[in-house]
């Protein structure tokens, strides 16, 4: 692969309903086989459910949930002298957002509600309150980093 220059990041256009870039990115994370309209229907359906259940602004619930799920540190494998160490490293802001969105999607998929919109609404509400599958995943990653703090001097 050529190493001439860094590939520029593409700008994501804000979503049509709320004009929010993070919501548009989340739709792209949810999208399967390029079916954006299906992803939009799921996200907007989940937002309607949030408004019904919680009576709060869905955008606020979404942003609080995303911020709660964002990891601060994670572990990376590093080989030193024939042994692999799990080295805790700080997570870049762009990766934080990407991981949070991915974890929310996966946690929502594993839930038992009927439709994906309902599952997503439930997961976003729980994450905004500091519980749920995505929060469990974040806490697990933080625990791993805490447990391997002794190897933090092997920084990359």
From Swiss-Prot:
Q: Which Pfam families match?
A: Ribosomal_S7
Cysteine pairs bridged by disulfides in the record: none
CDD domains per the record? uS7_Bacteria
What are the protein's UniProt keywords? Answer: Ribonucleoprotein, Ribosomal protein, RNA-binding, rRNA-binding, tRNA-binding
User: Mind listing the GO molecular function terms for this protein?
Assistant: rRNA binding; structural constituent of ribosome; tRNA binding
Q: What does this protein do?
A: One of the primary rRNA binding proteins, it binds directly to 16S rRNA where it nucleates assembly of the head domain of the 30S subunit. Is located at the subunit interface close to the decoding center, probably blocks exit of the E-site tRNA.
- Tell me the HAMAP family matching this sequence: Ribosomal_uS7_B
Q: Which family does it belong to?
A: Belongs to the universal ribosomal protein uS7 family.
- State the oligomer form and interacting partners: Part of the 30S ribosomal subunit. Contacts proteins S9 and S11.
Q: Report what the protein is called.
A: Small ribosomal subunit protein uS7
